[in-house]
């Protein structure tokens, strides 16, 4: 594995439904875990031995764009040291990406990067613009939080007429909690004020009463929740969304069309890494320290335990998840009114395992 920062430093609900997908199921190890999300694969002891089913016949160099500082993506960052990429015959060069989502997706569409990981709720609006990028899998759930003062609002309904602090008006957390507000009868466009702050000032804004809730992602929101006088109003692991993936794998359209086995190999390696991380969070936490800044292994371990790294989605199940997000993003005026959620989800998906 090599590391590249040339692009700057700013970030299977199951194989089912078709005969081809059914044939592929045998190459994934399924667990009889009663706590696994319905239809999702969960890690099994044999899962780590499954790489040969998707390993390439010869070594292939590949550029993977990701945010190496995002704790929820720690399994991706340590996939190399644990041999997941190597077992798939992949020689991965990490590109620590911090540009805008549009620049990231353009890098995939133009071949500057082969694959990337990121948050669905940040990517979908950009993908609506027509980038030649395909999503291949959802990797896990969790990592978005809405925080309030202990004596502040306790339900979404109580946020009507209030102000919510965010770091970015196009952030995945703003999009997600807009969906939740809408589900609870609060119009996120007209009934709520959104105000931007640097992430390290959200707590101060709460304490001063400038905002009544703060929205963001881990690790900062995990830390904010644990401060005295703060409480978690919600996360993205609630209601219908509890069983959905928040982060996804994307690949360039050209890679899917010309080298589908490569797209399958990198996707499978990443899914393996997340499943393995669910069983070995302590090891992942230690390994991730070489990438992370301003954290420690105990915090990384604790945050990983609150995410759902044992659950992922591919194929039709993944399309179903994206369609749910697309439907609800359309309802809160993020996606165009003319967008058909199901057709949109199908158009940006590639079933690399069929």
Enumerate the language-model features and the residues they cover.
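Secondary-structure end/capping motifs
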Residues: 257-336
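Conserved C-terminal helix/tail region of periplasmic/extracytoplasmic solute-binding proteins
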Residues: 38-40, 329-354
């Amino acid at each position: 594995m090599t590391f590249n920062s040339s692009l700057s430093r700013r970030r299977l609900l199951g194989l089912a439904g078709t005969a081809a997908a059914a044939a592929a199921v045998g190459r994934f190890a399924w667990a009889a875990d009663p706590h696994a999300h319905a239809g999702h694969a969960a890690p099994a002891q044999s899962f780590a031995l499954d790489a040969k089913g998707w390993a390439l016949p010869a070594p292939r160099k590949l550029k993977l764009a990701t945010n190496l500082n995002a704790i929820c993506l720690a399994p991706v960052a340590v996939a190399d040291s644990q041999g997941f990429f190597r077992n798939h015959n992949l020689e991965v060069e990490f590109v620590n990406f911090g540009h805008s989502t549009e620049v990231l997706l353009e890098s995939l569409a133009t071949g500057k990067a082969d694959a990337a990981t990121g948050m669905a709720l940040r990517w979908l609006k950009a993908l609506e613009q027509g980038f030649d990028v395909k999503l291949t899998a959802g990797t896990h759930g969790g990592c978005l939080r809405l925080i309030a003062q202990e004596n502040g609002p306790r339900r979404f309904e109580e946020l009507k007429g209030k102000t919510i602090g965010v770091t970015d008006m196009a952030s995945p957390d703003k999009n997600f909690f807009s969906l939740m507000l809408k589900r609870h009868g609060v119009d996120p466009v007209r009934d709520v004020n959104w105000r931007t702050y640097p992430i390290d000032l959200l707590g101060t804004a709460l304490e001063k009463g400038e905002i009544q809730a703060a929205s963001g992602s881990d690790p900062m929101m995990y830390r904010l929740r644990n401060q005295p006088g703060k409480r978690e109003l919600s996360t993205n692991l609630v209601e219908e969304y509890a069983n959905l993936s928040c982060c996804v794998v994307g690949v360039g359209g050209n890679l899917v069309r010309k080298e589908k086995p490569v797209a399958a190999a990198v996707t499978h390696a990443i899914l393996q890494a997340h499943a393995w991380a669910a069983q070995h969070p302590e090891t992942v936490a230690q390994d991730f320290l070489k990438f992370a800044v301003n954290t420690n292994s105990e915090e990384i371990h604790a945050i990983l335990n609150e995410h759902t790294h044992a659950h992922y989605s591919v194929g039709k199940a993944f399309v179903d998840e994206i369609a749910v997000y697309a439907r609800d993003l359309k309802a809160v005026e993020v996606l165009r009114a003319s967008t058909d959620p199901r057709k949109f989800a199908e158009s940006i998906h590639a079933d690399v395992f069929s």
